[in-house]
Amino acid sequence: MRTALLFILLLLTACNQGPTLERLGGPTMGSSYSIQYVREPGGPEPAQVQRAVETILHDIDHHYSTYRGDSIVSQFNRLPAGQCLALPPDMLALVSLGQHLAEQSDGAFDLTVEPLLDLWGFGPQARHQQVPEPQALAQVRQRVGYQHLRVKGRALCKDAPVQLDFNSIVAGHAVDLIAARLQAMGISSFVAEATGELKAVGRKPDGSPWRIALELPREDRQIARQIIPVDSLSVSTSGDYRHYFEQNGRRYSHTFVARLGRPVEHDLAAVTVLDASALLADGYSTLLLILGPQQGWDFAVAHDLAAVLVTRAEGGFVSRATPAFERAVKGQ
């Protein structure tokens, strides 16, 4: 009788347990990832979720890391001109998006920027950060250009010794994959974040929306400039304020105008883009940052992108939000 009564009490206690907020995270892509999710009674445990997430991130690293000699992208980058390499479908899809963004930006955005990153001191083969000599820059620019890539069946081919760098879009791709996996596991409310790119779906256990802080573009500390409610949207911010060097009083960031072979030279400090796809948000935030304050604004408005552009001004920053961003924040 006591055993039966104890079983009934335990069962009633389990039935009364509501949803809980679980958190987990770890290192990835030279940075970190974090997951918050609402665990319903009987839902997947954090350890199970973490294994699923890290399986995805391991595959991402094997496909896209330029810091691994055995990655697929490193294998492609070592190929001489005139050669092809069979790629997994997801890599071909990202190449296709990169080519589309390159065409939209007249070559300002370009996945073949890797040799420039190395030359200026931001890539995996970099020796030191400095402005390169004109002759060295001219030689490297011959190895940059999206027009040197072509897809042949399931293979990617090159007609010049170009090298790929997916860092402008791969974190968003990872977030989309993680979000899809969480939903397949029956998790309907979560925030999935990798290297700062994130996607929020559903609501917290108390029914309130997920709220995301958009930072001021400062390298010394983190200060929120705006906090927005997010549901079923991805948030991507690209900026030039954390990875840069200075030489002779000038600032050189890791964001490049590929067709010019140089870092950006304008006052646009950061761009945030909202989109249902973390991949697209990631790509377009980078593209707008490359284009600069006015050309980026014109592009965002013309393509109905939900974007905020933060420009350096005397004494601080000026933020400018597109109509699509205002609608997205209001849930329209």
Q: Which residues does each PLM region occupy?
A:
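N-terminal hydrophobic targeting signals that begin at the initiator methionine
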Residues: M1-R2, N16
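Mature catalytic core of soluble alpha/beta enzymes
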Residues: A14-Q332
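Bacterial N-terminal signal peptides
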Residues: A4-T13
